[in-house]
């Protein structure tokens, strides 16, 4: 879909908040989820499947679509990439048996700030 088509889709979604338009936006930006998941998959040392990362990222995409302020002068792709990445990392943290606080203490100890 071209830029004009995306703009029209966004305007339709904003005016109606229709699930149908939201689903079209999800399909339109699904490739962005795959891109972010692929980048994270290269750097994560966990035994997490790529398809799982994509699944976690879809939740981030849905959240980004629901919360995006189209009136601001920000590209959706930029905003959504951060939300998608955050959703993936949040799910991975939930699966980890070491609490986030312990990681914070470990990093502080390693840097000598503890």
Walk through the language-model features, giving the residues of each:
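Alpha-helical promoter-recognition and RNA polymerase-docking modules of transcription initiation factors
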Residues: 1-98
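Conserved small/polar residues in nucleotide/adenosyl-binding loops
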Residues: 104-113
């Amino acid at each position: 879909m071209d830029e004009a088509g995306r703009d029209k889709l966004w305007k339709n979604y904003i005016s109606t908040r229709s699930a149908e338009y939201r689903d079209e936006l999800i399909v339109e930006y699904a490739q962005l989820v795959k891109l972010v998941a692929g980048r994270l998959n290269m750097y994560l040392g966990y035994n997490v499947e790529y398809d799982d990362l994509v699944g976690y990222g879809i939740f981030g995409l849905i959240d980004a679509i629901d919360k995006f302020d189209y009136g601001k002068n920000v590209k959706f792709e930029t905003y959504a990439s951060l939300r998608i990445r955050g959703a993936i990392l949040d799910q991975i943290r939930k699966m980890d048996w070491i609490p986030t606080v312990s990681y914070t203490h470990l990093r502080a100890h390693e840097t000598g700030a503890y």
